[in-house]
């Protein structure tokens, strides 16, 4: 029986709270146990948590940051609608960043948590999300 080929996997959780990073931990643990090489990409508190949990893994902290804030009062939907153009720009920057990183680091697979710019047409990419049904009032 042949062993499956080992991959270099980029795992990139969003920094909108530690839930995004902690949700990736079981996948990282499994891939490491299976002998894959995992490279992490995040910023802020998520990056700190990942570096603490996986001190021997490479961490790319130059990934574009969404710099999200939550409203202190009022509608979350309205708050994000106001920041839509900036968020869209970050998705574009994220996508360009990934194209470069795939070549520089020979990434063979991507797993992102709510980072919508991390897709590549030549390698498998997956996205983790907890949003099953986005309720957008103006659609």
Question: What do the predicted segments below correspond to?
Answer:
Residues 5-7, 15, 34, 39-89:
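Conserved nucleotide-sugar phosphate-binding/catalytic loop shared by glycosyltransferases and other
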Residues 121-139:
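Active-site-proximal region of nucleotide-activated glycan assembly enzymes
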Residues 28, 32:
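Gly/Ala-rich phosphate-binding loop of Rossmann-like dinucleotide-binding domains
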Residues 46-49, 110-122:
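An aromatic- and histidine-rich active-site surface loop
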Residues 12-13, 42, 112, 129:
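Short beta-strand/turn micro-motifs composed of small residues
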Residues 13-25:
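A short, glycine/small-residue-rich beta-strand->loop->alpha-helix junction that serves as a flexible
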Residues 75-117:
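Conserved nucleotide-sugar donor-binding subdomain of glycosyltransferases
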Residues 10, 37-39, 109, 126:
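A structural signal for isolated positions on well-ordered beta-strands in alpha/beta enzyme cores
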